[in-house]
Amino acid sequence: MKSFIKKQQFNYIKRCLFDLNNTFINCSDPNIINVSKLIAQDKILSCFDKLSEGEKEILNISKITTPLHIDIYLNDLNIYVFGMENITKNQLVKIFKKEKKLKIPNLDIKDKKLVYLGWIDEATKKLLITYNLNGNLLGMSCRLTESKPNSSNICTLCNHIGNSAEVGFVSPICKPKNQDDYKSLGFYICLN
């Protein structure tokens, strides 16, 4: 069967199964465990638009009866996960044409299951992000902001949960139309 799970959907499934794992560990009532499993199943299926019967069967978590089955399920599910398409150096230069002295990262990435391509330009201390939104490659240049150590953050793009070293707060660089206006937005994103 063809890959049908986006990387961010896979991360969401992992988060749902983490909650189910906590239920297995902290609860002894089988009725509560079954209800938690049904809620997790509903959450997983609701993050997909259209699924065939075969895809629904692959996403079925009814056979998970212990926390050990969760890791096996996720390993089996990982073969159906896909990421963004390959990006060329010319595409990056075109997207970030306003960036001076742009340093392109190594595009021979081992993990092809990326949600976005991002790298930190050490000279300017900027995070440069390329994301495929509905078939169009978008680029964004962001300021890195210090965040509290040992805090858990959730990546906006891929739903990965990590500490401040893995998921950082960034603010896109915005140029206002009027000099008196100031606008700053921010969000959490994976740094690796």
Residue ranges and their predicted role:
Residues 71-125, 133:
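N-terminal, charge-rich interaction modules
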Residues 17, 22-25, 29-32, 108, ...:
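Generic alpha-helix signal with a bias toward terminal, lower-confidence helices
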